[in-house]
Amino acid sequence: MAFLEVVTRTFRRPAGLQRNRASLAAQSDADYVHTVIVDDEGIGVEAANARLADVEPVGAYVWVLDDDDWCIDERLIERLKGISENMREAPAVFVVRMDHRELGILPDVGRWCGHVPPEGAIGASALIVRADVWRQYREWWRTGRYASDHDYIAAVLNGEDHVVWLDWVVSAISRRSVGRPEVFA
């Protein structure tokens, strides 16, 4: 079993998906599997979120990294494994940070560590969860809300005790896309 399963939803953003894949290929430790969920129809954010609940993990940990996001920490897997191997029990959740461009680094310092950041102040790529934790909470992706990512995040952070907050900025977003496809000039 791979250490990390990276789950990427994609809809008509080939350049973003290519950048996403390249960022994973640059990892110093290639102990990951990349699951890509393709939307050929434009089903919308709510339905795309709901599809995440169908993911049956094949990695020890699961990380959602959409096609407009990419990993900026080439040692992410190596560093996560180092922490996991040095703890008595594997963490249920790693919380990391992301560069959300115009929104800045999320979660921001004022909302960091120990509590659930408010809706809009954290993104799905901030959580890396153990496979059993994914299975336990994945139905929260089906709330039918545009912000079901926050529903999932809140359920996980409110329900788990063994959460490791890492002040690492590990991903970036190309632009605030609100689910729109790329437009090429």
Report each predicted region and the residues it spans.
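Short, acidic, metal-binding catalytic loop of nucleotide-sugar glycosyltransferases
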Residues: T10, R19-Y32
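Active-site nucleotide-sugar/metal-binding loop of Leloir-type enzymes
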Residues: A50-Y61
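Short beta-strand-to-loop acidic/aromatic patch adjacent to the donor-nucleotide binding site
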Residues: G59-W70
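Acidic donor-binding/catalytic loop of UDP-sugar-dependent glycosyltransferases
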Residues: D69-I83
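Short beta-strand-to-loop element that shapes/binds the nucleotide-sugar donor at the catalytic cleft/hinge
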Residues: F94-L106
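Active-site donor/metal-binding and catalytic loop motifs
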Residues: H100-R101, S125-A126, L166-A185
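A recurrent flexible, glycine/aromatic-enriched loop bordering the glycosyltransferase active site
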Residues: V109-I128
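Acidic donor-binding loop at a coil-to-helix junction in glycosyltransferase catalytic cores
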Residues: G144-Y152
